[in-house]
Regions:
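Conserved HGGG/HGGXW glycine-rich cap/lid loop of the alpha/beta-hydrolase fold
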Residues: 1-39
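Short aromatic-enriched loop/helix-cap "lid" or pocket-rim segments at secondary-structure transitions
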Residues: 14-15, 39-42, 103-108
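Aromatic pocket-lining residues of Rossmann-like dinucleotide-binding sites
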Residues: 21, 81-85
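Active-site loop/oxyanion-hole signature of alpha/beta-hydrolase fold enzymes
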Residues: 28-69
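Gly/Ala-rich beta-loop-alpha elbow adjacent to hydrolase catalytic centers
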Residues: 70-78
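Flexible "cap/lid" loop of the alpha/beta hydrolase fold
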Residues: 83, 89-121
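Helix-loop "lid/cap" segments that line or gate small-molecule binding pockets
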Residues: 126-146, 168-174
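Conserved serine/cysteine hydrolase catalytic core
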Residues: 161-183
Length: 183
């Protein structure tokens, strides 16, 4: 099971590796509500999205998966799937997941501060702020392929993604608790 990162499209995170993995594994890749061009819905909450993932695994995999890999935000889903114990996974792998948690007030402040800065990058493929866009271009010129690879993983312009989906995802991730010592 592959779970993409914050505000990311599944194809940009995993499109290149799915064909390689399919040679040896049955591959499932999550498409979060609000982040795919084929749907016109919005991301609800981490728990609502987790319930949908669990329901799919229960119905289509008998409640058992061999492994789940979560990139960034996807790691929070791996943690939630393990903690809730509604499905069984043999291995949970976190990739660059910070698992940050915050109070509702702190989460709202972070969301309200960061989203206006990064949402234009998600929607239009570039920052609205000339300062941030120039910093990105300078960093890209200095670090070349690394920055280009990161931006490709993040995805190109996605005008179908709403600000509300981004807010819901970012805020909900911060306020959804994960217990300590998940088995």
């Amino acid at each position: 099971l592959l779970l993409p990162g914050t505000c990311c499209h599944w194809k940009s995170n995993f499109g290149q590796v799915i064909p390689l993995l399919q040679r040896d594994f049955r591959v499932l890749c999550v498409n979060y509500d609000g982040f795919d061009e084929t749907e016109s819905n919005e991301f609800p909450t981490m728990l609502a999205e987790t319930e949908k993932i669990e329901a799919y695994i229960l119905k289509n995999c008998g409640g058992h998966i061999r492994a789940a890999y979560g990139c960034s935000l996807g790691g929070s889903f791996v943690g939630l799937l393990a903690a809730r114990q509604n499905i069984h996974m043999d291995y949970g792998i976190l990739g660059s997941s910070d698992l940050d948690q915050a109070s509702p007030l702190a989460a709202r402040l972070q969301t309200d501060f960061l989203l206006p800065l990064i949402y234009p990058l998600i929607r239009d493929g570039q920052f609205k702020s000339r300062f941030l866009q120039k910093r990105l271009e300078k960093c890209s010129a200095e670090k070349g392929d690394y920055v280009r690879a990161f931006m490709a993983m993040f995805g190109a312009a996605r005008p179908y993604v709403t600000m509300q989906s981004c807010k819901n995802q970012f805020y909900s991730d911060l306020i959804t608790p994960l217990p300590e010592g998940i088995d």
